[in-house]
A protein has these predicted regions:
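Non-catalytic terminal regions of proteins
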Residues: 131-207
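Catalytic Zn2+-binding segment of zinc metalloproteases
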Residues: 5-15, 22-38
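Conserved phosphate-handling catalytic cores of large alpha/beta enzymes
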Residues: 57-59
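Short alpha-helical functional segments enriched in proximate histidine and acidic residues
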Residues: 24-25, 66, 70
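Active-site-proximal gating segments in proteases and membrane effectors
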Residues: 44-55, 68-159
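Amphipathic alpha-helical segments within well-ordered protein domains
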Residues: 64-68, 191-192
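A short mid-domain helix/strand-loop element embedded in enzyme catalytic domains
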Residues: 36-46
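Divalent metal-coordination and catalytic microenvironments
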Residues: 20, 63, 130
Length: 207
């Protein structure tokens, strides 16, 4: 935490940030050193490498839920994610609108109408979901029986979150054909190159 963060975030937003970081600790996310695994002398199989990136994105979703439970206010949670992602904390510069943020995900889902194509390649190697996806997943979390007594059940929640998260995943993760395996091998090499080029996954991404 920095003094600038304390000054720019209100109490509910800070509760989300602190709860998110505590969630990482409680769930043991730091026990899987993704950067170290990718840069090791024995690179992992392609399937595992892609799964690690996907796992990291889901780890962020679970930590977000811990933060959201602490904050108990979706608007504050979404605004905190916007501030963290954009670096813009002054509403005189840009005013955050939750419905516009969520509409970005609806647009992405509507555009994703080509079965078998999967997400753009650069998205596969991201350790964090896009902020609009995180906010959409948190909206679903707030609408579930984990947060509301009459909300959707957990299996339905997870199914809907998986649909959103698939926007950043390649179809090759599930493919069993020789071509799918070849593509996984190819993109494993790209993942290792990316990790080495940037001297591994940054501390911010590991957190």
């Amino acid at each position: 935490f920095s003094s600038s963060l304390l000054e720019a975030f209100n109490d509910s937003e800070l509760l989300f940030v602190m709860g998110h970081e505590l969630g990482h600790h409680v769930y043991g996310h730091h026990q899987i050193p993704i950067g170290y695994v990718l840069r090791g002398r024995q690179p992992p199989p392609a399937d595992l490498a892609l799964d690690l990136f996907a796992w990291s994105r889901y780890a962020e979703i679970s930590a977000d839920r811990a933060g959201a439970f602490c904050a108990q206010d979706l608007e504050s949670v979404a605004r905190a994610l916007f501030k963290l992602a954009s670096g813009i904390t002054d509403e005189r510069v840009v005013r955050f609108e939750l419905h516009e943020f969520l509409a970005q995900v609806d647009d992405m889902l509507a555009f994703d109408d080509k079965p078998g194509q999967g997400a753009p390649k650069q998205d596969w190697f991201s350790t964090h979901p896009f902020s609009p996806l995180r906010v959409k997943a948190l909206k679903l979390f707030h609408e579930s029986d984990l947060m509301a007594t009459t909300g959707m059940d957990k299996p339905t929640l997870e199914d809907q979150v998986h649909q959103i998260m698939s926007l950043m995943e390649p179809d090759y993760l599930q493919g069993k054909t020789d071509s799918s395996r070849a593509m996984r091998d190819l993109f494993l090499g790209a993942a290792v190159v990316i990790a080495n080029a940037y001297e591994g996954i940054s501390k911010k991404e590991r957190d």
